[in-house]
């Protein structure tokens, strides 16, 4: 807990990885904390055609996230997998307590993303991906 980062980014989806890339490029001592697998919702995407940046033909969510993750590492960002259970944002040094460790930083970026929220109607789970979707443009 003695290490004080310039910035800690909560979340390793596209927004968190982008923030980590730019923080690293700016030579900030950067830590990205993700509670699960890096990538967020985009890892469930089979084909990406309309994402800003250098997309290769047949790009999947997994391949894009892998490249983004590697870029953050190339610019010096560290990654840990932990679930943050408490935050103390008062004062110059912010303290984040996780299930595995405690982290300190001068700045925090919250990029925890979103998730599909089922409404709980009859047949919703049964027909997910078969007419029930959480992506309007996917069904267009």
Where do the protein language model's features map onto the residues?
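Glycine-rich, phosphate-binding/catalytic loops in enzymes
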Residues: 26, 48-49, 124-128
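Short beta-strand "acidic-cap" motif of Rossmann-like dinucleotide-binding folds
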Residues: 29-35, 42
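Short, acidic/turn-prone active-site loops that include or flank metal/cofactor-
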Residues: 37-38, 56, 137-138
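FAD-binding core/adjacent interface of flavoenzyme oxidoreductases
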Residues: 1-10, 79-140
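N-terminal Rossmann-like FAD-binding beta1-loop-alpha1 element of flavoenzymes
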Residues: 4-31
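Short amphipathic alpha-helical segments
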Residues: 20-21, 44, 120-123
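N-terminal Rossmann-like dinucleotide/flavin-binding domain of flavoprotein oxidoreductases
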Residues: 43-102
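Conserved Rossmann-like nucleotide-cofactor binding loop
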Residues: 15, 37-38, 115
């Amino acid at each position: 807990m003695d290490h004080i980062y310039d910035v800690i980014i909560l979340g390793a989806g596209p927004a968190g990885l982008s923030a980590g890339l730019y923080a690293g490029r700016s030579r900030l001592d950067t830590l990205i904390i993700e509670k699960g697998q890096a990538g967020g919702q985009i890892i469930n995407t089979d084909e990406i055609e309309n994402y800003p940046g250098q997309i290769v033909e047949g790009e999947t969510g997994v391949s894009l996230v892998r490249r983004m993750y590697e870029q953050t590492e190339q610019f010096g960002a560290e990654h840990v997998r932990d679930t943050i259970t408490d935050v103390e944002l008062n004062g110059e040094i912010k303290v984040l307590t996780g299930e595995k460790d405690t982290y300190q930083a001068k700045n925090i970026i919250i990029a925890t993303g979103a998730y599909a929220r089922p409404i709980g109607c009859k047949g919703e789970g049964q027909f997910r991906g078969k007419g029930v979707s959480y992506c309007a443009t996917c069904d267009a």
